[in-house]
């Protein structure tokens, strides 16, 4: 966000200074997470209530995931910095490529070698047969390849942010203080939301293997519906941030409403499509009839929440672009911990997985209403906009 402000103000030198500080801090932070993750990787599956037959595979997966955290963190940081410079297309293309690489690596690492017949010709498909461990390694390798590409385009090819001779890494107290004020609420929010996801898993785990599998596949299928919202939210962050940096405070609220309305419209359409083709979406992911039936039911429940989910996603991006992160983080915390989790814990023993997703649907609608109310009636995010305006960037 600070990079977008600097570029909007025409201060490319300041943008590069913040970029280098941000990459250094992100790397150090990811190393801390790596240490914590590897330390708890063996016992975490048991804490979450996993059955003994899956705990060993879960340990292997989470261990590889933890070891890959620095790569993932630098990948995310580089992509966000490219987006903040106004280059939305390249990170999106690279993330799509990462998905294809993930599938390709998984195909070779998860399954053993086998023969297939294609047009009367027998082909040998090599494979290592590593199972769950192969899935983790495939994802980590895909992240590594794309991280290298992201860093190359950021540090060598970006018109505004590529490295220049004579510009060394140095930490500025003012930059770090502003970064802490903006990022700490977001970091705490992500930590709390991750904890909430763990608690959700804990609520689903006792419902049995079919419910666990249906829940996992449904989350994967639903991501096709809400990913456009996150893309629009990222674009909104850049637009608002550069408007702030340029001193165009008159544009911030108008762009905020345009982006939020557009996101809601897109996800309303994708939600309607998801409702219609839910059985087919789950069928692609699982051959099990029971998983297909349960997964389709919960996807259709969630489809009704997609427009309001979009409101919270995009409006959050708008607020972040203006430097307003504390109140949105509090709204996310309250809706997740005070609405979704208690309601899911109450409904799960009575309605099973359907109850968990009903709780999710209700919570997302409430969250969307809260974000729309803040966008409409609160002026404090406009004040946050002015606090990070051009006078502070000189």
Feature annotation, model-predicted:
Residues 1-35, 72-91, 201, 214-278, ...:
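Small-residue-rich hydrophobic transmembrane alpha-helices
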Residues 100-147, 284, 293, 336-369, ...:
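Membrane-interface helix-loop junctions in multi-pass transport and translocation proteins
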